[in-house]
């Protein structure tokens, strides 16, 4: 029993690390741009395909492929900002719809480029840390956890300690006021989109060898991310991280003891309860609806 | 009087075209026509819901509730098909009534996400419970509409043309009902709740009750659409009512525009023709979602008020007088 | 006999800020009662608490002895208390006539089934007649086809009142009805309000135009920083030292 719980905990930790990367990106984009980016799951998928192309297909080192995933998907984010969200700045529903269009384009591109079948990527490492007979953490999962901690730490430093980070947080609070302080809305929007999308991309890239990569993998990711940002509070980055961890534990636990569909139902029900009881989320204060 | 005469002639002409239409189409196009007819009811009911200003992501699941309910009523209880369809519609309305209690504590973005969660939970229940919902594979061998004949006309409802006439008549009736509702004081109150719920309340409008009313009525019609579809296709499964399908409904509605009754209908027709007929004929099988996505983006960028705004420019809207 | 409209130790707190602080006053039936005070005194907040927009943090509002505070806005409205809003709050996308029709909601309650079957002809006709009457009362009948959002400011204020009037209120709460009106319009509107009062409607009015308030009101309540400052007839209030002090020095900010 203890073994099972410990193993579940490790699995949850792994899930929490990539979920929080995705969710934090989504919150950042929502905070600064004011749009719900429905294509966020497909940005994750795009990151995974960069690894498929460069690492599995091109033989590039894994880390390089991951970095390329971050950069490439970050650029996709810039493209979205430029082509969709900037022209639709006064039309939040329009931004949402446009992101749905972008999602379809990304999906179709993946289907055309790689086919609908699942991609099998050679594992980065076969090593496993065995805490006991039954409690084991594959090295490749540990890499994801470490990378998530490092990236989120870097983001935290950037947001709290640098001028741009300060500008970003200010414009997430109040874009007009931030603009009056001499911070260009366009610049903060571009930074937020690059980082937000890049985080989704890097999450997809990191997990690519561990999951089945396919053009429709973004769907479950975006659903999870929505649950997490609602539970954590729509405007709150810290909330997103905490909620990711909490959600990952609950979901993994329920999956282990019942099954995955029940776990999904439990997750969605949790979100519904939070929406009913405290729509601003457990950690959120700002009401941006 | 001449205006009335003109209108009668116009509508008669429209009806004649609609009756003749399937005979000008290939078999697969006839099937698409049936689905499109049913989808017209889905988008029209969706518009009724959006009249009060709330956008739901659970509407397709409500369509599915009608489909599952009607299929199960015939299968498990042996209720004859046309009756089960109506019961399916009622079931959707009832479920919507139940959902309205938690959901209408939310507004705007939260309602959007909340409706998604509620719908997804229902869908996952279908997927999880083999009894009675059939699990991931869904329900197969759903009873079709029984054949019948009026005088010289025989209707075999496996034939798309026959089913098109049946579904077309039902949908036309429903659209007429929806239109009556929208043009009534009730519809005006829906608009009022949308534009200024505070002012509406201060005039004595129970805003929550009106939101619920719109949601329940829209869901009833959506459920009927689901039942119409289920008894034609003969099989349903949870994936048929997932969020991707919802995205299509959302897209039809937005590309068409929601300011008018006909906007979402235009969106549904235009995009269905584009997606199913033009792109298919041109052989862009894999590229269809890509082009579809691009059309979505282009229309929201360059035609933010929808296709209806093109029509509105041509015809000055007339205002309601009793 | 109970007083008509009674505000009893009404308190409204927002976090740390107490916007209305134990305010009490009564409004006589058939009176035009003014509520004045410097900017930020808590007048709109008082209106919001009376009309059910806010649930008061403390105290009660009673109408004919019945407690109405804590009810939701439409329930308060159904008891005959109709309010207008400080900023031109209208159904901007709808026509002037449709706006007025919304005011008739309570008298001619719409019904889906009747509407579909066509059994609501009588009601529709009645609502239409009432709406037109309200527009005529406020001199807006010529504009009935216009989009409400396109109206001039003064007309928008008048339309806000027409909606309230169409609802057959017992009490109307008017929040700064004269802003955006030129002197002639204001004078005409004052005349209309007297007519409204004479038809049996009690009026509680917030207004910064002192000329209008003094000329119109039977009784005036002056508040400052959420508290009652003075109460009396126009002459008393005009010469009340505390009131003069509040308006000259005590205001937090001047408009
Ligand atoms: N929803 C709210 N949340 C927090 N504070 C509020 C809220 N509404 C009003 N206040 C505060 O309460 C105080 C009273 O505001 P109120 O609008 O009632 O003043 P007022 O007398 O109507 O002023 P004016 O003449 O400018 O309209 C102000 O300090 C205002 O900032
Ligand atoms: Mg005020």
Feature annotation, model-predicted:
Chain C
Residues 2-255:
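Glycine-rich phosphate-binding loops of nucleotide-dependent enzymes
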């Amino acid at each position: 029993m203890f073994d099972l719980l410990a193993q579940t905990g490790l699995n949850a930790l792994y899930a929490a690390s990539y979920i929080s990367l995705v969710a934090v990106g989504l919150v950042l984009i929502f905070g600064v741009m004011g749009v719900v980016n429905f294509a966020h799951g497909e940005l994750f998928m795009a990151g995974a395909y960069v690894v498929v192309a460069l690492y599995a297909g091109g033989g590039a080192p894994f880390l390089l492929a991951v970095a390329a995933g971050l950069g490439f998907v970050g650029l996709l984010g810039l493209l979205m900002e430029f082509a969709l969200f900037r022209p639709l700045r006064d039309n939040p529903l329009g931004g949402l719809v446009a992101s749905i269009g972008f999602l379809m384009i990304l999906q179709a591109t993946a289907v055309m480029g790689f086919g609908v079948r699942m991609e099998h990527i050679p594992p980065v490492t076969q090593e496993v840390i065995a805490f006991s007979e039954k409690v084991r953490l594959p090295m490749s999962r540990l890499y994801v956890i470490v990378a998530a901690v490092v990236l989120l730490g870097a983001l935290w430093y950037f947001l709290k300690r640098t001028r741009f980070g300060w500008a970003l947080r200010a414009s997430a609070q109040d874009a007009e006021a931030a603009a009056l302080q001499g911070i260009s809305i366009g610049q903060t929007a571009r930074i937020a989109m690059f980082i937000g999308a890049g985080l989704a991309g890097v999450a997809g890239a990191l997990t690519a060898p561990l999951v089945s990569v396919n053009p429709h993998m973004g769907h479950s990711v975006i659903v999870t991310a929505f649950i997490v940002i609602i539970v954590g509070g729509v405007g709150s980055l810290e909330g997103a991280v905490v909620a990711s961890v909490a959600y990952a534990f609950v979901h993994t636990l329920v999956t282990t003891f019942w099954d995955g569909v029940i776990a999904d139902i439990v997750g969605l029900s949790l979100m519904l309860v939070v929406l009913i009881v405290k729509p601003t989320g457990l950690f959120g204060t700002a009401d941006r609806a | 009087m001449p205006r009335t005469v003109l209108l009668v002639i116009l509508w008669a002409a429209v009806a004649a075209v609609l009756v003749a239409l399937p005979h000008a189409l290939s078999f697969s196009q006839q099937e698409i026509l049936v689905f499109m007819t049913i989808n017209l009811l889905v988008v029209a009911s969706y518009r009724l819901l959006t009249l009060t200003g709330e956008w739901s992501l659970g509407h397709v699941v409500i369509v599915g509730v009608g489909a599952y309910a009607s299929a199960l009523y015939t299968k498990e209880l042996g209720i004859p098909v046309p009756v089960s369809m109506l019961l399916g519609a009622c079931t959707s309305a009832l479920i919507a009534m139940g959902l309205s209690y938690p959901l209408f504590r939310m507004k705007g973005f939260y309602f959007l996400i909340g409706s998604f969660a509620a719908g997804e939970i229902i869908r996952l229940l279908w997927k999880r419970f083999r009894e009675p919902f059939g699990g991931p594979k869904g329900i197969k061998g759903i009873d079709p509409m029984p054949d019948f004949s009026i005088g010289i006309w025989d209707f075999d409802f496996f034939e798309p043309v026959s089913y098109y006439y049946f579904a077309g008549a039902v949908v036309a009736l429903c659209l007429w009902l929806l239109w009556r509702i929208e043009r009534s004081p009730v519809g005006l109150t829906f608009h009022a709740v949308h534009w200024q719920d505070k002012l509406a309340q201060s005039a004595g409008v129970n805003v929550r009750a009106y939101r619920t009313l719109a949601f329940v009525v829209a869901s009833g019609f959506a459920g009927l659409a689901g039942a119409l579809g289920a008894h034609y296709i003969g099989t349903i499964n949870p994936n048929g009512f997932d969020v991707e399908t919802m995205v299509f409904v959302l897209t039809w509605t937005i590309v068409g525009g929601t300011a008018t009754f006909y906007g979402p209908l235009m969106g549904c027709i235009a995009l269905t023709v584009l997606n199913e007929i033009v792109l298919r004929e041109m052989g862009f099988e894999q590229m269809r979602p890509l082009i579809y996505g691009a059309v979505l983006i282009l229309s929201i960028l360059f035609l933010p008020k929808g296709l209806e705004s093109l029509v509105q420019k041509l015809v000055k809207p007339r205002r309601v007088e009793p | 006999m109970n007083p008509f409209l009674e505000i009893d130790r009404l308190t409204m707190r927002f976090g740390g800020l107490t916007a209305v602080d134990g305010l009490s006053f009564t409004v006589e039936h058939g009176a035009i009662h003014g509520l004045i005070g410097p900017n930020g005194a808590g007048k709109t907040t008082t209106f919001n608490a009376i009309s059910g927009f806010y649930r008061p943090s403390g105290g009660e509002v009673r109408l004919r002895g019945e407690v109405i505070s804590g009810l939701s806005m439409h329930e308060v409205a159904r008891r005959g208390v109709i309010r207008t809003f400080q900023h031109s709050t209208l159904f901007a996308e709808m026509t002037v006539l449709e706006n007025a029709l919304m005011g008739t909601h309570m008298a001619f309650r719409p019904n889906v089934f009747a509407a579909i079957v066509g059994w609501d002809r009588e009601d529709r006709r009645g609502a239409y007649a009432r709406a037109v009457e309200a527009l005529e009362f406020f001199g807006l009948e010529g504009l009935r086809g216009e989009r409400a959002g396109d109206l001039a400011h003064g007309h928008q204020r008048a339309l806000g009142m027409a909606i309230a009037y169409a609802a057959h209120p017992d009490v109307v709460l008017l929040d700064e009805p004269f802003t955006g009106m030129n002197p002639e319009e204001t004078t005409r509107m004052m005349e209309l309000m007297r007519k409204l009062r004479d038809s049996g409607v009690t009026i509680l009015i917030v207004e910064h135009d002192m000329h209008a308030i003094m000329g119109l009101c039977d009784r005036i309540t002056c508040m400052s920083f959420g508290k009652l400052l003075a109460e009396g007839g126009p002459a008393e209030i005009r010469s009340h030292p505390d009131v003069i002090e509040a308006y000259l020095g005590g205001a937090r900010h001047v408009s």
